[in-house]
Amino acid sequence: MRTLRVAWVAALLLVPVLCSAHPLRLSLCQIEYSSQAATLTVSLRLFLTDVNEALVFDPYSRALRFAEADESENAEPLLLAYLVEVFSLEANGELLPVTIQSKVLGGAGEDTTLSIGFSHPLAAPLRSMTIKNVVFTDLFFDQTNIVYVHVDDDSHSMMLSKSTPSHTLEF
C-alpha cells in the first residue's frame, strides 16, 4: 500500500512537468500583399523555446534574450543565419532576401513567442509566390508550419512540413 501511495504522489508531481511544455510543434507565418501599397509583408511567430533549441540547443536558455533591452549581440545574426536556411520566399520568380526588421516577444512561460517581421516592395504586380518553410523540421519530426497568405481580397492557407516543404501560388 505504501508503494502504491508513493507511486501516486510521484505521478501527481510529474503532471505539472509534463503539462508545462507547449504541446504544439508549429509555427505561424502570415504573408500579406497589397497591390495598392506594392509591398509584401512577412510575419513569423515562433515559440521562443523552439528558437533557443534550434540556435543554442537549450530551450530554456536566456543567453540570447531576444527582443529584450539586453539582447545578446549574437542573437540577431544567429537567428538570421537560421532563418535563411529554413525559410525562403519567391515573388514572381525572384528570391526575396530574408531580413529581420522587427522582433517582439509575446505570451509568457512555455507559451512565449518571438514574432519576427520584415517587408519588401515589389516593382511588378504579384503574379506568383513560392513559400518554403521548414522551420524546426530538423528538430521535431511532427513540426507543422502554418502559412496564411493574403493578397488583396484573396486568402490562402497551407500547412508546410518536412514532407511538404514548399508551396507555389499563382494569382
Language-model features and meaning:
Residues 11-14, 163:
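Intrinsic disorder/low-complexity segments
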